[in-house]
Amino acid sequence: MGKARSYEIIEYRKKIMDEICQSQELVKLLGCANEKHPEDIIPYKWSFPHEYIPDTIAETDKFINFEISAALDTRNNVYKDLTIYFFVVCHEDVIRYKDKGINYLWYDKVTCELDNIFSEKNILGVGKTYLVSNVPY
């Protein structure tokens, strides 16, 4: 008996988390640039592979979280319409982010880097990903 199709979602989550942890820019934006092994610190502390928005951010915390939605094409037994939702949140005291003398919104810098990492690339092995929306909720 083979493995269930749902195991692919687990693999996709791991690939996305790996990309976040391997991005020097995201590592820097999460405040882990001086860490020897950010891949051991970021998952489940600064990035959650599920929809997670903390109730109250009491410290100057920053989070890059994500969720996956996928529909199964039962005729071909493959996932189609795979959607990755990123939830980028931070404490209000760190929204303003200064880089090389220029002020940005922290979450705008994160969004740009996520776009650089994932757009028009086949990271998950299911075809190229595309930015569909950049609308906050």
Language model segments and positions:
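Acidic-leaning, charged glycine-interspersed low-complexity segments
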Residues: 27-28, 57-60, 105-137
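Small/polar-rich, solvent-exposed N-terminal microdomains that initiate assembly or binding
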Residues: 1-76
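Oligomerization/assembly interface segments of phage tail-like spikes and tubes
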Residues: 78-93, 114
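Short histidine-centered catalytic/ligand-binding loop motif
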Residues: 94-106
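Short conserved micro-motifs at the rims of enzyme active sites and ligand-binding pockets
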Residues: 77-78, 98
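Short regulatory "switch" loops immediately downstream of catalytic or recognition motifs
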Residues: 25-29, 90-95
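Generic short beta-strand segments
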Residues: 68-71, 89-91, 134
